[in-house]
Amino acid sequence: MLHKKEMRTTSNQKYEITEISHEKYPFLHRIRALRDVSAEVRAGDLGGFVESESNLSFEPDDTAWIFDDAIACNDAYVDKGAVLRGEAVVCDNTYISMGAVLSGHTRAEDNAYIRGAVLSASARASGFSMILNDKDTMGVPILSGHCAVYGKVSGDVRLTGSALVISGEEIRNDTLDTLVISGKNRSVIRDSSRDELAPQQPAPSPPKKQKGCEMSR
């Protein structure tokens, strides 16, 4: 029998690991919020499953959460507002961060790193894959269908169907367009405003030198 006091460190005031074990994997247990975590998670709400506190951040201001029957186990770690929903699974040495959302039957395994991306349906990240949002363009990778990523995907990229990114391959979109990859087909979605012309913005004038401020030689 597991005791709650043995399942929570004194510094974790965000959630506790309950005695409710997973039906198939009894080494996993549901979490319960000890305080209001976000607008969606209130004190007393049950969450998904973890193996230990090492799977989900309990930093005071971190809204990262595991919902429904989702699982985080082994050395997988979820933090910085990322959430798992449905029956999503993150395991092995994966790192899910920066508001990433995994739902449906998605799976992140091996050494996958997912930052700010959205995965749904049966999308999978394996190997040393990296699926990253673009901090400059604010582009977010969106994966769905049965797509699988073993390489690197970044920016506004939509992978769907049976799209496959193999190990060593990089799909990078650092533009304002949306790159769509469905199976072996590739296309681009452009906003009509991208085709409009605008006058060049004048360069800022250099600051004027003030008298008496020049350095003597």
What role is predicted for each listed range?
Residues N55-D195:
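Structural signal for interior beta-strand "rungs" in well-ordered beta-sheet cores
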Residues M1-T63, D69, E87, N93, ...:
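Terminal amphipathic alpha-helical/low-complexity segments used for targeting or macromolecular assembly
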